[in-house]
Amino acid sequence: KIQKEIREKNLEKVLELDWGYEIEELRCSGNYEFLVGWTKKPSISKDMINLVKSSITQDFLKKVEKIVQNLKSAMKNGNKMEIKRNILENGNELKKLKEEIYSEELVELVEATEDLDVCAKSSGSGGGDCGIVISFSKKDSEILVERWKSVGIELLYKSEL
């Protein structure tokens, strides 16, 4: 759909279209940190991206939409267990979509969170080289970043939510 729109309209008009999504500010009820780790090693080639795109079904999109809405609600209400559950569930849906999304390095990025008060998953943006984390403890964020460094993963971004 987007390719057709881009061919027929200028970028400003394309951006103004209703894509069925919305961007809104999310006010979190709790003190969380958001971290992005970079493995420096894309796992997905152009061919793999096309394969993943062809695997995306309406069922997958509906499941992910439900997860996102549940996550949004959990963050607004400060429900840590639901936040963790939804991040994990989203990561599992990405794995089911295409196991190759999780490179060995991305698996390490997620496994580094073990025994910490954090949750992690692939960013899901398509390159297979970044993971995102929600941390519920500044101390655990520091421990996680050190674990990442020890396996060559770089902290790309960190902010408080």
Ranges and model annotations:
Residues K1-S125, I132-L161:
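C-terminal nucleotide
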